[in-house]
Each structure stands twice: as structure tokens, then as C-alpha cells.
């Protein structure tokens, strides 16, 4: 991944007033790799006073999780509400020997964990229970952006108060659209077609 100018995002760049009205604060896991980014994340987490604001974390990459585990643990200690990850990232964060052990790790957590498994669909772990959602059967062209599309779509549905199974179903559908095109974004028409679902 190329972080570009975002690697220099620091606490001074944050609009804290806007954050007070935010429904979700979404933390991209790559932000642990930059001291400025990590400082900004901690500053925002410390400043959130609205108990309705959902704090969501993407684990981003298994190698990043392994290399910066202490920083991820520090973010977790602020009281995360949701974690998004793929199966490799889930195993890395849980420091588990296999996926089954990782599932048990997340069942004992207070936050919701949403795990994507590519063509095998996705799993939500919430309050000790598992909810499985099958993938949409398609022929992928390019998986770039699929995880971000999944997380964004899931959170969109969650804010609209969909049942968790429906959140996952919508996210699976949306991410199935992104992998059928080259690049990490849909056309404007593609996004509009999703909004009306």
C-alpha cells in the first residue's frame, strides 16, 4: 500500500468539532506505521465524548499486525466497538495457531469482529455468537479495494439498523461488485446502484 501524504496526518490536522457529530470513527490499521498517524489516532480516541460514536478498526494487513502488535493492543485498550479483518489478519491479531482458535479468541471480546474470507464469505462474531454470510458467486477480476468496500458497506448498513446478517449480505454483495472491475473504485453509476438496495 502507498500511504502518500496521509502518512503525515497528525493531531493538528483533525477537526475535533466535526468528530463530536460523527457516527463512526474508522481507524485504518496502516496508521500504526507512522508516529504522526498513531498520535492522531490516540488523540481522537481520547477526545471522543459521544458514547454513540462507534469506534471501528481495520487490521489492514497480517504483516502490519505482527510488526506493530503493541500499537494495535493500545488502540484496542481505548474500547473499540468493531474490528474488520480478513482471516489471516484475524489469526495474527489473536496470535492464534489456526483460524478456529482465533474464532474462540474473538468470542471472548466485548467488541464485534467482522472477518472476511474471500470466496468463502464472511463471519461476524458478536456477543459470543457467530453469524455466517456466504459470498456472492462471481469470477473476480481484481480484488484491490474489496476489503475497504466490504467494511464501508457493512458500516453503512449497520447505521441504517439492518440486522447483522443483512449488513454482511449487503457488504458481500457490494464487495462482489468491486472485484469485477479493475481498480479499487466503482464508477459513480456503480455506487448509485448500491445505494438503492
Which residue stretches match the model-derived regions?
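Conserved phosphate-binding/catalytic loop of the ribokinase/pfkB sugar-kinase fold
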Residues: 1-36
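Alpha-helix N-cap/helix-start capping motif
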Residues: 3, 87-88, 148
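A short, aliphatic-rich alpha-helical micro-motif
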Residues: 18-20, 76-77, 107
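Conserved beta-alpha-beta core of the PfkB/ribokinase-like small-molecule kinase fold
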Residues: 24-103, 120-122
Amino acid at each position: 500500500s502507498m500511504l502518500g501524504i496521509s502518512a503525515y496526518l497528525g493531531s493538528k490536522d483533525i477537526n475535533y468539532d466535526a468528530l463530536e457529530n460523527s457516527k463512526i470513527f474508522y481507524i485504518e490499521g496502516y496508521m500504526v506505521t507512522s508516529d504522526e498517524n498513531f498520535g492522531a489516532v490516540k488523540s481522537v480516541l481520547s477526545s471522543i465524548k459521544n458514547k454513540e460514536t462507534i469506534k471501528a478498526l481495520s487490521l489492514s494487513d497480517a504483516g502490519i499486525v505482527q510488526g506493530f502488535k503493541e500499537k494495535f493492543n493500545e488502540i484496542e485498550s481505548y474500547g473499540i466497538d468493531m474490528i474488520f479483518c480478513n482471516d489471516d489478519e484475524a489469526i495474527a491479531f489473536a496470535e492464534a495457531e489456526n483460524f478456529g482458535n482465533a474464532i474462540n479468541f474473538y468470542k471472548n471480546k466485548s467488541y464485534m469482529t467482522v472477518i472476511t474470507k474471500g470466496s468463502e464469505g464472511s463471519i461476524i462474531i458478536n456477543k459470543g455468537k457467530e453469524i455466517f454470510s456466504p459470498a456472492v458467486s462471481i469470477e473476480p477480476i481484481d480484488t484491490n479495494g474489496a476489503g475497504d468496500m466490504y467494511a464501508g458497506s457493512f458500516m453503512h448498513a449497520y447505521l441504517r439498523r439492518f440486522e447483522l446478517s443483512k449488513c454482511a449480505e449487503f457488504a458481500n454483495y457490494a464487495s462482489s461488485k468491486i472485484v469485477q472491475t479493475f481498480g479499487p473504485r466503482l464508477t459513480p453509476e456503480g455506487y448509485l446502484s448500491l445505494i438503492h438496495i
